[in-house]
């Protein structure tokens, strides 16, 4: 629903041409892949206190794609955090995750959250 309203808004109100819209969708798809890669790496690493780093890194990589990547990172991050709240995860941890998400989306270095000893592979 949110996506369809956004599409209609862009076409009717903003007058976005099809080329810009296709670029936005491409960036969003690439950004979603960046978010998935960060999530997969986090699960693979299974490293204590590394989740904030992977949150920041996924958002950072997605945001580098452009406005579509920023949008995808925000939608995915918000959906994940809302789900975590729904299942009873602590609000304090969710707030810290969102801060890491915003840090990365803003173009700040995700290594700020990198824990010591995390393998260089990540």
From Swiss-Prot:
Skewed-composition ranges (Polar residues): 99-109
SMART domains from the UniProt entry: SAA (SM00197)
Organism classification: Eukaryota, Metazoa, Chordata, Craniata, Vertebrata
Induction: Up-regulated by cytokine stimulation.
Disordered: region residues: 88-122
First and last residue of the signal peptide: 1-18
Pathology noted in the entry: Reactive, secondary amyloidosis is characterized by the extracellular accumulation in various tissues of the SAA protein. These deposits are highly insoluble and resistant to proteolysis; they disrupt tissue structure and compromise function.
Species this chain originates from: Oryctolagus cuniculus (Rabbit)
Signal found in the keyword field: yes
Role: Major acute phase reactant. Apolipoprotein of the HDL complex. In vitro exhibits antimicrobial activity against Escherichia coli, Streptococcus uberis and Pseudomonas aeruginosa.
Tissue-by-tissue expression: Expressed by the liver; secreted in plasma. Expressed in synovial fibroblasts.
InterPro entries assigned to the protein according to its UniProt record, in alphabetical order: Serum_amyloid_A, Synovial_Prolif_Regulator
Name of the protein in its database record: Serum amyloid A-3 protein
Entry's family note: Belongs to the SAA family.
GO biological process: acute-phase response
Gene assigned in the entry: SAA3
Matching Gene3D superfamilies: Serum amyloid A protein
């Amino acid at each position: 629903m949110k996506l369809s309203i956004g599409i209609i808004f862009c076409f009717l109100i903003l007058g976005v041409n099809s080329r810009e819209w296709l670029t936005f969708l491409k960036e969003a798809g690439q950004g979603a892949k960046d978010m998935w890669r960060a999530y997969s790496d986090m699960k693979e690493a299974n490293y204590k206190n590394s989740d904030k780093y992977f949150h920041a890194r996924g958002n950072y990589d997605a945001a580098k794609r452009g406005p579509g990547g920023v949008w995808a990172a925000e939608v995915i991050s918000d959906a994940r955090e809302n789900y975590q709240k729904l299942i009873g995860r602590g609000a304090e941890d969710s707030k810290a995750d969102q801060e890491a998400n915003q840090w990365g989306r803003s173009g700040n270095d995700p290594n700020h959250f990198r824990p010591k000893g995390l393998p260089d592979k990540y």
